[in-house]
Amino acid sequence: MHTFFVTSTGFGVGLTSTSLGLVRALEYGGLKAGFYKPVAQQHPGNSKLEYSTELISRTLGLAPPAPLPLATVEHLLGEGQIDDLMEDIVRRFKQASEGYDVMVVEGMVPTRHVSYASRVNTRLASSLDADIILVSSAEDDALQAITDRIEIQAQFFGGAQNPRLLGVILNKIRTDHSDDLFEQLKNHSTLFHQSSFQILGCIPWEDSLNAPRMADVVTQLQAQIVNAGDSEKRRVQDIVLFASAAPNSVTLLRPGVLVVTPGDRDDIVMAASLAVLNGVPLAGLLLCSDFPPDPRVLELCKGALTKGLPVCTVTTNSYDTAANLHRMNREIPLDDHERAERITNFVANHIRQELLVKRCGEPQEQRLSPPAFRYRLVKRAQEADCRIVLPEGYEPRTIQAATICQERGIARCVLLAKPDAVKAVASARGITLPEGLEMIDPEKVRRNYVAAMVELRKHKGLNEPMALAQLEDNVVLGTMMLATGEVDGLVSGAINTTANTIRPALQLIKTAPGFKLVSSVFFMLLPEQVVVYGDCAVNPNPTAEELADIALQSAASAQALGIEPRVAMLSYSTGDSGSGQEVEKVREATRLARLARPDLLIDGPLQYDAAAIASVGRQKAPGSPVAGRATVFIFPDLNTGNTTYKAVQRSANVVSVGPMLQGLRKPVNDLSRGASVEDIVYTIALTAVQAASQR
């Protein structure tokens, strides 16, 4: 499923009309196209309905979900919760996109009240992994002004260097030489020199498409209806303010003209009526200056009225009435299906749909954005329906995380703690414990696992008193619950060390078949995508064989979470440029990993920049299937991995999820002792997904 994100270069460019036409153009190309506007922006006269969503729903017969209210979005932004906002939008988008080949997503329109629109649009496009299409108006401005607006907006999305920035649709073009427009724009902007940035549509100005119905004039001017006539059908193609005597004005009485005149100008009223009786389909008659028409004159004009001539009155004088008409909102009214349909087809016919359809057919390198990762992680955890034990059941963050997981259906959490103690902590912290949250008093169940533990460790000389003593540690108790199959996974580490969490697992759970060691990965939520770092927490100095094992484990973990694994074996040199014991270890690990999994994309040794940055990768490792596009980064030792992970996390303010332990027969995961409630929630979700994949 492909996604196009359309965003405007300013206010009044016709973004929604372009979205209508874009969906129709994609349908012309044989694709089933859907629409979604993530954030509501109210329009004048439509206080209850989100304009874009409602108009597209009525015109195209689609059923897009309701967008988030602007007030909700502003509250989340103000609280610094943009990641939560994006995750919610990704969730709604996934639901909205089911069954479609392609989705058109409409961004926020920058206005003086929504100055943050461009920042939100940038995050939206990235979170939805979308191709970006700019929409700009070429109405009256000079070419330099047009290109300046396009370039400024393009910079928000990475400019010409971003291959996902496809081009621009130019709307409201008031020239008959649109074919020459591209060459003219190239002379004013280097952006158009890039072969990847194209004009995707040139939509000329068409007066007839902007003609409102007389009913719209009545509504917006709050006019009083004298004769409704065909006000729902007749359209205002031109407006004429009649001030001269009738004989001097008759040539202005043309089809589609709205006659504006003071209500006491009986001569103009009768002249307009005669024109209608002679077959001229005037748009209507608007009487101003608070002069009601003379009933005797209206009786004389009855023939014209019965032929459908709309007549209405306003209280404003001629000058103010003309000004009000000029200020009318020319957007398509929600109930004007005829005009919406005509504009949709007109725009669609001026969009280069063959380019967009071709783009949809091109294989795209999958990139999992942080909000999409979090959404997918939670959804898969909910589907897994796993029981996860939390040995640190008294710890406040753990209690709150368990509450969230229980309420959201992420996992069925088991707190190892006395229920009264848990309730006391929850009460003190203002946490409402949900129904069904399981709390087990460790003192009442320790002896239940003595025999099973002795059986598992009898080869090490373990006896019952020794087992009971070890079971006093809740981590050991929780690990035994996992070993006996009573729970599906274990999460600990908020107050315990990594060694205290992992040691019981190595002794009682042991490694999974086919794996020689236990390692770890962090999921690094970089701004553009989620990547995997391994091993940054467990193995100090792995051998080449162990490093190959870590690479294969990490690739499997990435794949389980929807990340396409492209594995970079990292070193301080790239390819054959360096030598030494450490480089040779990485080279040998790469060979072993490729031998074990020839279907995986694995390359090394690679320097970090060659693995992560496309331009550097092309220069340092031309022909590499991984360089510049790696999603799984395997560090040569713990010192390098842990230092890099913390440097990226802190200096770039990157959220990380993990460490997730891999290679165990059943999932056990360690927390950082500084873990937030959110960190614990996502680690529980990770554990549930791991458990489901091992069933």
UniProtKB/Swiss-Prot annotation:
Keyword hit for Nucleotidyltransferase: no
Keywords: Acyltransferase, Cytoplasm, Transferase
Compartment list: Cytoplasm
Keyword Metal-binding: no
Gene3D superfamilies: 3.40.50.10950, HprK N-terminal domain-like (3.40.1390.20), Isocitrate/Isopropylmalate dehydrogenase-like (3.40.50.10750), P-loop containing nucleotide triphosphate hydrolases (3.40.50.300)
Enzyme class per UniProt: transferase
GO cellular component: cytoplasm
Pathway: Metabolic intermediate biosynthesis; acetyl-CoA biosynthesis; acetyl-CoA from acetate: step 2/2
Any GO MF annotation of the entry: phosphate acetyltransferase activity
One Pfam family matching this protein: PTA_PTB
Residue span of region Phosphate acetyltransferase: 372-695
Enzyme nomenclature, EC number: 2.3.1.8
Main location: cytoplasm
Domain of life: Bacteria
Entry domain remark: The N-terminal region seems to be important for proper quaternary structure. The C-terminal region contains the substrate-binding site.
Family note: In the N-terminal section; belongs to the CobB/CobQ family.
Subunit description: Homohexamer.
Name of the protein described by the UniProt record: Phosphate acetyltransferase
Species annotation: Nitrosomonas europaea (strain ATCC 19718 / CIP 103999 / KCTC 2705 / NBRC 14298)
Gene name linked to the record: pta
